[in-house]
Design a protein with these regions (language model features):
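A structural motif
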Residues: 147-161
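A cross-family acyltransferase "interaction/gating" segment
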Residues: 162-261
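Catalytic core of membrane glycerolipid acyltransferases/transacylases, capturing the structured
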Residues: 80-132
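Charged, low-complexity C-terminal accessory regions
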Residues: 223-306
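A short secondary-structure junction signal
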Residues: 93-94, 117-118, 136-138, 155, ...
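Short His-Asn-centered micro-motif
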Residues: 71, 83-86, 107-110, 154-156, ...
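Short amphipathic alpha-helices and their capping/turn segments at secondary-structure boundaries
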Residues: 138-147
Length: 306
């Protein structure tokens, strides 16, 4: 029941808050919220039965056609920090579906939604709302990296514009210095880890914003843009409106934490962010693998027949 209540609230929050309107929308959105909460409950159970990666692949297939992968994937072993933009909805599912590793943990804010998914709890590094308690998050990440595990971090710490929906915008927000602090901590404690930038796009298909659902152009009504995108998210999770669309995942070069010797946390973070920003240029010069990934690097989210 918690999942249903939370899902319904998330759908309603993108619409007018008048009591009568909200009551009517609650009736309208009840079935989509019920379907979504059912899918998420099944995902939570599947994590225990099938593992996080396979559970994510199966859930992703409920919402998207596939993941189109561009570039060489991460190494199969050794501590790995995956740094990705965060357009929302399917980005985590795309990353999990594409990673060939079973040791993944995701850094995520403490939310009621995640608490309602008990199967996911062991795969999360929760970020407390109280900033004074966040030093433990850095220590938990460092512990996983030292042990050779994979950590997925969204360094902007917030939802960012989808780079395929907004090619006229710079989709990488300012990053947390946690990236640089982790590198310095590893150097001080005598271990190293890989750093893999990633860029995810296409989680919000452009066709969902045609006609009356069109979004304001860059520099226009920012609040209006965010509202229309939140409503599109509702159609994706509640009505599977992106079921025939693919998410694109571009991998950057694999960096190593010990190649940044002598730099400050801010300088390290800036260097890695610059590397990730280079992925934005993939679709702006020459052939466009964002739209036409090479045959060698394109694959479905799952090898299972549909």
């Amino acid at each position: 029941m918690d999942l249903l209540r939370i899902s319904l609230k998330d759908l309603l929050d993108a619409y007018p808050s008048g009591r009568a309107v909200r009551l009517g929308l609650s009736v309208l959105f009840f079935l989509p919220a019920l379907l979504f909460s059912g899918r998420m409950a099944r995902f939570s159970r599947n994590i225990g039965k099938l593992g996080l990666q396979e559970a994510a692949r199966r859930l992703l297939e409920e919402f998207y056609a596939s993941v189109q992968v561009v570039g060489d994937g991460p190494p199969a072993e050794g501590g790995l920090l995956v740094l990705s933009n965060h357009p929302g909805v399917g980005d985590s599912l795309a990353l999990l579906a594409a990673l060939e590793r079973s040791d993944v943990r995701i850094v995520a804010g403490e939310r009621d939604f995640f608490r309602a998914l008990p199967g996911l709890a062991g795969s999360l590094i929760p970020v407390p709302e109280d900033e004074r308690k966040r030093i433990g998050v850095l220590r938990a990440m460092a512990g996983d990296l030292r042990a050779g595990r994979t950590v997925i971090l969204y360094p902007a710490g917030r939802i960012e514009p989808d780079p395929l929906l907004h090619p006229d915008r710079y989709p990488l927000e300012e990053w947390s210095f946690a990236v640089g602090l982790l590198v310095l901590l590893a150097a001080r404690e005598g271990f190293r880890f890989g750093i893999k930038p990633a860029l995810v796009g296409g989680v919000l298909p452009g066709r969902l914003f045609e006609g009356r659902n069109s979004i304001p152009a860059a520099g226009g009504d920012e609040a209006g843009r965010e509202l229309m995108e939140r409503r599109a998210v509702g159609r994706i999770i509640g009505l599977a409106a992106a079921r025939r669309d693919s998410v694109t995942l571009a991998w950057g070069r694999t960096l190593m934490s010990d190649q940044f010797a002598g730099l400050s946390a801010a300088e390290i973070t800036a260097r890695v962010m610059e590397e990730a920003s280079g992925l934005l240029r993939i679709g702006t010069s020459g052939p466009d693998p964002w739209s036409h990934p090479s045959r060698e690097t394109t694959r479905r989210a799952s090898g299972r027949p549909r």
